């Protein structure tokens, strides 16, 4: 009752990174609230799944193991969470802002007449004063995300309804094991009690999972281009520089919208979150939604001819100049000094 819950996405028998990241954050939230962290695993052949989950500080793992629960389909997983939450009455539920999370989250929140904030970039605990009603709500979940095209950062609260639900993209939170020997309780539920047979009406006949074309999230060096790159050809310079530095190339939303780069290279609140050791921003102004996806980089270098570009305020080093001037010189330098 009144605990923090995390829904675990599972591919085969492997828990997704985004879910493990949310367990790390959920553990911190539970500590602040003085409650337990619980997780929900729904899939097939899940024996031993607790070995992946409990080390993140999970006090209770709810396991729903049945052939009809993998691959994911909407109705069975919705019934699992809706009926479990009616029993357990969590105060917070977190899930990944993935294809599955974007389908499952709204279904569950609607059925429980709760609210949901999508694509949060930060989650905190705090108080809220409703001056109109003259009420003060303590220990609410601050669901923080950019809004209005990234021009402001909104803090959203859900004072009255439970659970407070939020989705978070992969990479936004850090994944950290709490204790490899953490002792938590594992509960194997009777799936038939929670999921009616009619929920299995949709069956997945075949699946095709494509591998990622690049490793933007895990790259130690990321070179990102913005609208200031001017064209798709401008991005060719970044790929040439990336080849010399053994880096990956990313892009801002403006550059992707302009057709300069593919969407899977987009960095920011509506793209990938990265934490490289070195982040080189080329022709990027630095809207809030972009900064949300790279602000925890080790060293940030901004190449920009606008001294007042917002990204310069968080950059460790600023190179004032056009990308057409600076990047060719960098390429020439690294080519001449590489072995």
Language-model features, listed with the residues they occupy:
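N-terminal glycine-rich FAD/FM-binding segment characteristic of electron-transfer flavoproteins
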Residues: 1-339
């Amino acid at each position: 009752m009144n605990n923090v819950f995390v829904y675990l996405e599972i591919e085969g028998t492997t828990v997704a990174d985004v879910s493990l990241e949310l367990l790390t954050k959920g553990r911190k939230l539970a500590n602040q609230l003085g409650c337990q962290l619980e997780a929900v695993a729904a899939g097939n052949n899940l024996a031993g799944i607790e070995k992946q989950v409990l080390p993140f500080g999970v006090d209770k793992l709810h396991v729903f193991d049945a052939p009809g629960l993998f691959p994911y389909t909407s109705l069975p997983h919705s019934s699992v969470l809706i009926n479990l939450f009616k029993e357990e009455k969590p105060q917070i539920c977190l899930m990944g802002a993935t294809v599955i999370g974007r389908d499952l989250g709204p279904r569950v929140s609607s059925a429980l007449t709760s609210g949901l904030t999508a694509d949060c970039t930060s989650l905190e605990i705090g108080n809220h004063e409703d001056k109109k009603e003259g009420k003060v709500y303590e220990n609410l979940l601050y669901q923080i995300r950019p809004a209005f095209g990234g021009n402001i950062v909104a803090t959203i609260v859900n004072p009255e309804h439970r659970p407070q639900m939020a989705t978070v993209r992969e990479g936004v939170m850090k994944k950290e094991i709490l204790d490899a020997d953490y002792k938590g309780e594992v509960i194997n539920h009777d799936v038939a009690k929670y999921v009616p047979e009619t929920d299995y009406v949709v069956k997945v006949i075949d699946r095709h999972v494509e591998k990622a074309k690049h490793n933007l999230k895990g790259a130690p060096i990321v070179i990102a281009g913005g609208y200031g790159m001017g064209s798709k050809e401008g991005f060719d310079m970044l790929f040439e520089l990336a080849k010399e530095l053994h880096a990956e190339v990313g892009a801002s939303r403006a550059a992707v919208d302009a057709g300069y780069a593919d969407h899977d290279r987009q960095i920011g609140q509506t793209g990938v979150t990265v934490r490289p050791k070195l982040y080189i921003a080329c022709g990027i102004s630095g809207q809030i939604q972009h900064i949300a996806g790279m602000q925890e980089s080790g060293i940030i270098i901004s190449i920009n001819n606008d001294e007042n570009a917002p990204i310069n305020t968080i950059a460790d080093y600023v190179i004032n100049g056009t990308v057409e001037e600076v990047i060719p010189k960098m390429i020439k330098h690294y080519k001449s000094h590489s072995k």
